[in-house]
């Protein structure tokens, strides 16, 4: 993730996980781990704690509830954190265009970190690079149609990180949808394109 984000920009790289909470490769756990790498603690003035959650200036975030100016699933960045005359912490966010908003602590209940998100939350969105963890803990959710949704969020590059047997299981697993039967061919074509560009067959990065 760090390498791709440095090359393409954080806004163009997205980790997509089948689960939000289950396992070390779930989106919530990945968000905390990735954030410590790309946006570590600098000062107390540049972060705010809401319950057991922490937000920092420069964090990548997602809106999780529709409002007048932003929709559920919209992505943005925290651009500043201030304190008003009553001592309340206020968080400035930029969702692109003229959507520069200030959030109270109560409104942050509808905001999540978004370095990683669930595949479901990413439906309808596209990113230059998509990184997908393929691990045993996600087996129960890894059907062909879900993997297809994740792979097709990528405009330029897909990185699969994990275990090949789990990937093959997901590609061939019985599916309730008929429209995703070309997933195996799509992954093969990604591999062929990668091979042509790098002159070497790609290997799945082995999970540590």
Where are these regions (language model features)?
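C-terminal accessory regions
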Residues: 74-208
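Conserved helicase/translocase motor-coupling segment
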Residues: 1-72
